[in-house]
């Protein structure tokens, strides 16, 4: 039996796919850079070997699954081609894997990971379900009927999939290094829609998605009256959100989610719509929606000292706005401080004013240096260009996160798609030191 070798195994999709193959009984290994990524924890728990990149890792008997961030000139891929080993790109392998399941591809400019996680949780509790989530989580469930997968639009990679269903959460202009306009993004989504076998579930409040023309049913969901599935009577509380759902004007039920913001209501509504279409019991869907704990790096909360620290993947103006609004719903009486690390120079330059406008919805803003990508390590702007447009003109360094101590009782949002987590980790060490120092002072006073 072949051994599957993943080039770039710490990538979020790659990590999840490696776990799926491992669960299905295949022998799996992979390689990547030495740097720690949150995705590797699950790999280590399953004892999947992780090596440092080297041509010497490539031996006879391997099937190479190559991450999309790595060109054919990468040393391991080059060696594999020299040896005549099978080399297949991540998205193409996944496209083949989902055949034979009732597959549900979740795509959209924003909300893919959260919706895939929610769908996997709900459907997986009702019927056996395999899943691949963009937070690095994957499961190759034995006897699975369903396969839920996050489908990324970047470079049109999702066109490798021919799923049974698709959920389209929204269309927005992102990845400006590849997509030239929102029309370009729309064309990619419509092309995917034409490959879907049974039905597309699309946000009907999104003007772009309303333009879809397909030969299969398009089931629209949203807040507007014209949607087939409509969320009404939304009640936002500090413990979560309640809402009623109507299907073609008929009351379907009252639902509750332990999540915040309109975007999470819409994510849940898409799952409710698909489950209804598939005939899954509505009472089971209600029950499972209540127990979803979220996905990694999406409004992940840590309470430390007297502050609330939130880790979030938000890296686009629309996502930052949604994250700030969610924080205000859950913590209405707290100051909101945004710590943001822009991801890629092209995106930062293209959406510079949009980033400023969204960040300025917070009470205070701190900016980290721009995080480049494997494809784009430098650019013709600096973080100062964005800082000049935001409240306070603050730029924060990993070595000096103690500046955030100025905001007792605040919610501090660490946002970004790069390695903004290192800023949170550094700040948590500062807080730990502060707590220890305070304890020492109290002890001295007693003595």
Swiss-Prot record:
Keywords: ATP-binding, Cell cycle, Cell division, Cell shape, Cell wall biogenesis/degradation, Cytoplasm, Ligase, Nucleotide-binding, Peptidoglycan synthesis. It catalyses: UDP-N-acetyl-alpha-D-muramate + L-alanine + ATP = UDP-N-acetyl-alpha-D-muramoyl-L-alanine + ADP + phosphate + H(+). Its main location: cytoplasm. It is found in: Cytoplasm. It is an enzyme of class 6 (ligase). SUPFAM superfamilies: MurCD N-terminal domain (SSF51984), MurD-like peptide ligases, catalytic domain (SSF53623), MurD-like peptide ligases, peptide-binding domain (SSF53244). Coiled coil: none annotated. NCBIfam families: murC. This is UDP-N-acetylmuramate--L-alanine ligase. It comes from Listeria monocytogenes serotype 4b (strain CLIP80459).
């Amino acid at each position: 039996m072949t051994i599957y070798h993943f080039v770039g195994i710490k990538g979020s999709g790659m990590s999840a796919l490696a776990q799926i193959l491992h669960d299905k009984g295949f022998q799996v290994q992979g390689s990547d850079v030495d740097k720690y990524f949150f995705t590797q924890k699950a790999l280590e728990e399953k004892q999947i070997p992780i090596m440092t990149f080297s041509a010497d890792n490539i031996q006879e008997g391997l099937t190479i699954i190559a991450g999309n961030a790595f060109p054919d000139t990468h040393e391991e891929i080059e060696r594999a081609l020299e040896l005549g080993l099978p080399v297949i790109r991540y998205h193409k392998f996944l496209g083949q894997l989902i055949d034979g399941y009732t597959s549900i591809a979740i795509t959209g400019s924003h909300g893919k990971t959260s919706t895939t996680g929610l769908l996997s949780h709900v459907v997986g509790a009702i019927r056996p379900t395999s899943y691949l989530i963009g937070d690095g989580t994957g499961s190759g469930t034995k006897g699975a009927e369903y396969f839920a997968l996050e489908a990324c639009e970047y470079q049109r990679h999702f066109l490798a999939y021919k799923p049974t269903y698709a959920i389209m959460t929204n269309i927005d202009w992102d990845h400006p290094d590849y997509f030239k306009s929102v029309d370009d993004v729309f064309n990619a989504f419509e092309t995917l829609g034409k490959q879907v076998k049974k039905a597309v579930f699309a946000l009907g409040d999104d003007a772009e998605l309303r333009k879809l023309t397909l030969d299969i049913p398009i089931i629209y969901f949203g807040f507007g009256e014209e949607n087939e599935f409509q969320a009404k009577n939304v009640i936002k509380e500090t413990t979560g959100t309640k809402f009623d759902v109507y299907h073609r004007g008929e009351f379907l039920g009252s639902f509750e989610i332990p999540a915040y913001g309109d975007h999470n209501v819409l994510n849940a509504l898409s799952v409710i719509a698909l489950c209804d279409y598939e005939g899954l019991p509505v009472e089971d869907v209600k029950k499972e929606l209540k127990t979803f704990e979220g996905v990694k790096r999406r409004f992940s909360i840590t309470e430390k000292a007297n502050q609330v620290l939130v880790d979030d993947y938000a890296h686009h103006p629309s996502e930052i706005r949604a994250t700030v609004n969610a924080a205000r719903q859950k913590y209405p009486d707290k100051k909101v401080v945004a710590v943001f690390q822009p991801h890629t120079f092209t995106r930062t330059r293209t959406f510079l004013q949009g980033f400023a406008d969204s960040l300025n919805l917070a009470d205070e803003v701190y900016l980290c240096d721009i995080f480049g990508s494997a494809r784009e390590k430098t650019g013709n702007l600096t973080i100062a260009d964005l800082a000049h447009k935001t409240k306070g003109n603050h730029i924060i360094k990993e070595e000096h996160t103690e500046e955030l101590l100025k905001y007792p009782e605040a919610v501090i949002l660490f946002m970004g798609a790069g390695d903004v987590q290192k800023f949170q980790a550094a700040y948590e060490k500062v807080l730990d030191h502060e707590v220890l120092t305070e304890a020492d002072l109290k002890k001295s006073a007693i003595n």
